[in-house]
Regions:
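Signature of the first transmembrane helix
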Residues: 3-6, 18-76, 237-263, 379, ...
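Interhelical loop/hinge segments that connect adjacent transmembrane helices in multipass membrane
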Residues: 4-16, 188-195, 206-248, 296-299, ...
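Hydrophobic faces of transmembrane alpha-helices in multi-pass small-molecule transporters and flippases
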Residues: 20-40, 98, 102, 133-137, ...
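Membrane-interface alpha-helices at helix entry/exit sites of multi-pass transporters
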Residues: 56, 88-100, 301-310
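Helix-loop junctions and terminal segments of transmembrane helices
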Residues: 71-87, 272, 276-300, 365-368
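Interfacial segments at transmembrane-helix termini and the short loops linking adjacent helices
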Residues: 117-136, 263-264, 325-357
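Hydrophobic alpha-helical transmembrane segments
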Residues: 130-134, 163-217, 381-388, 396-424
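Membrane-interface junctions at transmembrane-helix termini in multi-pass inner-membrane proteins
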Residues: 142-164, 296, 351-381
Length: 427
């Protein structure tokens, strides 16, 4: 406990490039741990329970994750930008941001639930149940809050906090699953949701405690609520546009695969795509850490960019090599057909870590220097080009064509980002 307290109570000292790298490692490790533990959760659920129960629960969890992407509204990114500009008011800004996060998540979840029983049944089955709807609302709030807390930890230079919260989430979710299995072998779909709710509560409680002991006492008098809210929303919405432009292809490509090649092909594509995104989280997390460092110092430091790039390439490159080597084994866990159809796809997608590193460093610098709309344009063009190229090549060559189309767009974006980043650093 003493060691854990030391992790979260180090005084808030804004950081040079080496601390940016340390924070990036914590963020990347936390996000990767979250996805890895989530994979194990679903693997265990598939072993313990019927496909109907697992499928219905997965539909609701996927719907929740979609809601969290919209419900963030860039609030966490706004904190990364605004905290360095409002010294002495960090505690106040974080409090206001978290309250807005709760309100926004509830609003998005209610809108989603209000879409109608037909759509929701397609997403998860038994969502018409009031209990399932209530659990869904809680999951959306906790899931969105946890994402904003991750970004807040980056703003404070405390990447280790992210790892602690995500490991706690995974452990509690696993214990909840085992508890449900001990009680009954034939639970209702809504029962598994409570394992996620319990995990979300644990992660958020830990996060609140971390911020309580980490954030310095407020100084400089009482902060105007309207001013804080205006700064958070003004900065946040611009960052949200970039985030949505960047993440939209992850949601669109599986849908396109179904339309072009059919559901069977998508069954092989989706696990390969998710494995690739575990890798992509590494440069994305490091880019977020660079964003925090640039926003703090209000200038682009070559040493910070070089350190972040080196960290991303070392960790992401090592992980990519590991995935390339173990691709067949990883997919074989799901079944022989998955390994046969998806091994080459995973290997090609894994190579995307290298050009994506340049793109994410560029995005991080753009976020930190108020060049949001420039980066948003690049992300939108890259995403549209990636989906278009993947669709054209996929229709002719199947899943490997989808992978080649996506990789080509990522590589082109990486080249542009490298050139543009070089120009920005020379100014």
């Amino acid at each position: 406990m003493t060691q854990l307290r030391e992790v979260v109570t180090v005084p808030t000292v804004r950081r040079p490039s080496d601390v940016v790298s340390q924070s990036a490692i914590g963020m990347a490790a936390g996000r990767a741990a979250s996805m890895a533990l989530g994979f194990l959760f679903w693997l265990a659920a598939a072993r313990f329970f019927t496909p109907v129960v697992v499928g219905a629960t997965a539909g609701l969890v996927s719907s929740m994750m979609l809601c969290t992407q919209f419900a963030q509204f860039g609030i966490g990114n706004a904190l990364i930008t605004e905290l360095p500009r409002n010294r002495g008011q960090e505690r106040y800004f974080v409090t206001v941001a978290l309250w807005w996060t709760v309100i926004a998540a509830l609003a998005v979840a209610v809108v989603f639930l209000g879409l109608g029983a037909t759509v929701l049944r397609q997403a998860g089955g038994s969502v018409a149940s009031p209990v399932a709807g209530f659990a869904f609302l809680i999951m959306c709030v906790l899931g969105t809050a946890n994402i904003v807390m991750d970004q807040t930890s980056m703003a404070l230079g405390r990447g280790a906090q992210v790892l602690i919260r995500n490991l706690s989430f995974g452990a509690v979710a696993a214990l909840g699953l085992l508890g449900i299995r001990a009680i009954t072998a034939a639970p209702r779909p809504v029962s598994l949701l409570w394992a996620w709710v319990a995990a979300g509560v644990a992660a958020c409680v830990i996060g609140l405690w971390q911020f309580h002991v980490t954030l310095p006492p407020a100084s400089g008098g009482h902060m105007n609520h309207r001013h804080a809210s205006a700064r958070i929303w003004g900065t946040g919405l611009a960052n949200q546009a970039l985030t949505l432009a960047e993440r939209a292809p992850t949601l669109v490509l599986p849908i396109v695969v179904v339309q072009v090649l059919g559901a069977r092909a998508n069954a092989a594509w989706y696990p390969a795509w998710m494995i690739a995104w575990v890798l992509y989280i590494i440069p994305m997390s490091v880019g977020m850490a660079l964003f925090s460092g640039v926003a703090d110092e209000r200038r682009i430091r070559r040493s910070a960019v070089a350190s972040a790039t080196r960290t991303s390439l070392l960790i992401g490159g090592a992980a990519a090599i590991g995935v390339i080597a173990a691709a067949h084994l990883l997919l074989s866990v799901l079944g022989k057909g998955y390994a046969t159809d998806g091994t080459d796809v995973v290997r090609l997608l894994a190579l995307g870590v290298f050009p994506l590193t340049a793109t994410q460093m560029y995005f991080g610098v753009c976020r930190g220097t108020d060049r949001i709309w420039e980066a948003t344009g690049v992300a939108a063009i890259s995403g549209i080009a990636g989906v278009a190229a993947a669709t054209i090549l996929g229709a002719d060559r199947g899943l490997i064509g989808f992978a080649w189309g996506w990789f080509a767009a990522v590589a082109a974006s990486g080249i542009w980002s490298t050139v543009r980043l070089t120009v920005l650093m020379e100014r």
